């Protein structure tokens, strides 16, 4: 039987006939269409009802992005970036700009868990590169954040260092789980439920056949500003509104490509 929107399945835009952009997608329409890229999530969902700071409800997690399956410290990857505004924040950004590469996995989580997640990445790096900080340089982890405190007991800082290791070590290629998973578990987007999203596009052969993939942790926007293919969807869907959150939120966007680009060129792509 043909599936309907009421069937309980979560549809992706293209499954509903909404085609965005001019280029075809990769096999999975995900950042993992870029060869070597791996994604891992650890998702925390527990409790309900009124907020009890330090206890719950818990709606949070951590997402790991690995540029390849090898030793990232020994096989560094060219990188660039761009800051649209100060939130979300990202550790390791200055060193990435200065050096022109990344040398650790990229982790996404909530604002108050950044420190713990950094510790988890450092544990992972020491485990895989024992000479870090002894006979080799120290490490500057890349951890990006958004504020999930509307839905999550953010003061509880429920993500642990062990969960960070699990997200990194369980990362895989292939289809990417989206929505309320990993770092995106407690996020809100245009006053709908937000979270993790991903897509990819493949250039035609005459343009190099390169692949670009994107993964976002979406936690931004007011309902009235949501536009899809030129249609003011947010202004049409005026019900289903939850309690308003503080501010306008933020978004973290990670772009990967197999095109042979320098750090300067990657800076431009990130813009």
Task: List each language-model region with its residue ranges.
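Alpha/propeptide regions of enzymes that mature by internal proteolysis
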Residues: 2-271
């Amino acid at each position: 039987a043909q599936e309907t929107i009421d069937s309980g399945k979560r549809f992706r835009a293209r499954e509903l006939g909404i085609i965005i952009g001019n280029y075809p997608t990769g096999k999975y329409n995900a950042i993992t269409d870029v060869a070597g890229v791996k994604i891992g999530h650890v998702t925390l969902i527990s409790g309900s009802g009124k907020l009890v700071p330090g206890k719950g409800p818990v709606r949070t997690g951590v997402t790991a992005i690995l540029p390849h399956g090898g030793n990232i410290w020994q096989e560094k990857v060219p990188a660039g970036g761009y800051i649209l505004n100060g939130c979300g924040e990202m550790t390791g950004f200055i060193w990435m700009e200065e050096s022109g590469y990344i040398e650790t996995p990229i982790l996404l989580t909530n604002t108050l868990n950044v420190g713990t997640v950094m510790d988890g990445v450092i544990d992972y790096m020491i485990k895989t590169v024992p000479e870090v900080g002894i006979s080799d340089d120290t490490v500057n982890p890349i951890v990006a954040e958004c504020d999930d405190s509307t839905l999550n007991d953010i003061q509880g800082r429920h993500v642990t260092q062990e969960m960070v290791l699990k997200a990194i070590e369980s990362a895989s290629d292939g289809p990417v789980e989206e929505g309320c998973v990993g770092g995106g578990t407690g996020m809100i987007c245009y006053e709908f439920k937000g979270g993790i999203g991903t897509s990819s596009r493949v250039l035609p052969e005459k343009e190099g056949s390169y692949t670009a993939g994107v993964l976002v942790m979406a936690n931004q926007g007011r309902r009235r500003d949501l536009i899809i293919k030129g249609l003011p969807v947010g202004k049409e869907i005026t019900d289903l509104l939850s309690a308003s959150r503080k501010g306008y939120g933020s978004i973290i966007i990670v772009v990967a490509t197999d095109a042979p680009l320098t750090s300067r060129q990657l800076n431009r792509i990130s813009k």
